[in-house]
Amino acid sequence: MARTVNCVYLNKEAEGLGFQLYPGDLGKRIFDNVSKEAWALWQSKQTMLINEKKLNMMNVDDRKFLEEQMVNFLFEGKDVEIEGYVPQKDDE
């Protein structure tokens, strides 16, 4: 049976991550409180941020910025804002 967590992002019980994906205390907090589904949502936002803002993961300041955005997204309910990005509308 899959491990479940009370996901702080989705506000519901959901399947948890298989293992700790991020180092340190923040990684433990993510592992204990963020679901697989919420993590996948973050990964797509993270990819957009890296590409649109041309972040370099070798740069400490860029990594710090990305970590701040991750905490804001997963734990504080703040969406990632990317200048000029317009979400695709679902065709009805």
Swiss-Prot record:
Assigned keywords, A-Z: Iron
Organism encoding this protein: Shewanella halifaxensis (strain HAW-EB4)
GO CC annotations on file: cytosol
Function: Could be a mediator in iron transactions between iron acquisition and iron-requiring processes, such as synthesis and/or repair of Fe-S clusters in biosynthetic enzymes.
Domain of life: Bacteria
Signal peptide from the UniProt entry: none
HAMAP family the UniProt entry points to: Fe_traffic_YggX (MF_00686)
InterPro entries referenced in this protein's UniProt entry, alphabetically: Fe_traffick_prot_YggX, Fe_traffick_prot_YggX_sf
Keyword Lyase part of the UniProt annotation: no
GO molecular function, one term: iron ion binding
Descriptive protein name: Probable Fe(2+)-trafficking protein
Ranges in a coiled coil: none
Family designation: Belongs to the Fe(2+)-trafficking protein family.
Gene3D superfamilies: Fe(II) trafficking protein YggX (1.10.3880.10)
